[in-house]
């Protein structure tokens, strides 16, 4: 355990608590079996938020142990992709962030089953921390709107949850302004407007960590850095835009 955590640059402040809980698990055949089963469940992408699973009490880092064997695999995969070492270290620090989140919520460091479930995106190599943000790798995500751009650079959003009509001459629908669907209907002539984003486009979903600067320069630098990393390291993962539904 110590060798893996050191090599992956994770959870250094919590080492003693982790080793203490590991000793407890080793003493219990039932807990050892549970950790093995959870590791296999995580590897196949199983849902750990299922209400039929009741986590054992009294072992704060139990749900970290199924993830530890996957950590070197994650680092090796990112290096194979030529992801910058600074991004790899920052990405692996999501384990520390998960413990810190529970520390703020409960008053003690721990790694709960919900955090293991969340980190499946990292375990399955679909997650990066770049600059200020966490980024899921490209996928199709529900937008709720379709995005249109005019020949003058103007952007318009039409709500996708109500009918959008497309004729030979125009796109017709209800505009979405500041997140609110308007009652009026607008017409966007095709001579000047084209659809820029729709339900079949691949997007990069963004998550906003609680700590860190949030000024415009920091945000734009993070987007630019993310574009560079995706272009250089994930040329087989094209995307059309960034999308954020984070808290």
Placement of each model-derived feature along the sequence:
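A generic secondary-structure signal
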Residues: 225-233
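Non-catalytic substrate-recognition and accessory regions of acyl/acetyltransferase enzymes
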Residues: 1-217, 232-247
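Glycine-rich acyl-CoA binding loop
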Residues: 215-226
């Amino acid at each position: 355990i110590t060798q893996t955590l050191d090599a992956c640059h994770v959870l250094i402040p919590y080492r003693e608590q982790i080793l203490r809980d590991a000793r407890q698990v080793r003493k219990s055949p039932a807990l050892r079996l549970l950790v093995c089963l959870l590791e296999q469940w995580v590897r196949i992408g199983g849902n750990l938020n299922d209400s039929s699973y009741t986590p054992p009490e009294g072992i704060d880092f139990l749900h970290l142990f199924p993830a530890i064997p996957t950590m070197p695999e994650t680092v090796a995969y990112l290096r194979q992709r030529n992801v910058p070492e600074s991004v790899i270290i920052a990405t692996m620090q999501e384990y520390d962030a998960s413990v810190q989140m529970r520390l703020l919520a409960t008053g003690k460091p721990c790694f709960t089953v919900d955090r293991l479930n969340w980190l499946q995106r990292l375990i399955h190599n679909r997650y990066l921390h770049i600059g200020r943000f966490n980024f899921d790798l490209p996928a199709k995500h529900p937008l709720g709107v379709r995005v249109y751009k005019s020949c003058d650079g103007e952007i318009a959003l039409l709500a996708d949850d109500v009918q959008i009509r497309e004729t030979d001459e125009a796109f017709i629908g209800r505009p979405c302004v500041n997140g609110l669907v308007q009652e009026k209907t607008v017409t966007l002539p095709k001579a000047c407007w084209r659809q820029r984003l729709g339900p079949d486009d691949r997007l990069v979903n963004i998550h906003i960590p609680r700590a860190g600067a949030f000024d415009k320069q920091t945000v734009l630098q993070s987007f630019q850095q993310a574009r560079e990393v995706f272009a250089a390291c994930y040329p087989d993962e094209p995307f059309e835009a960034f999308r954020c539904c984070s808290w």
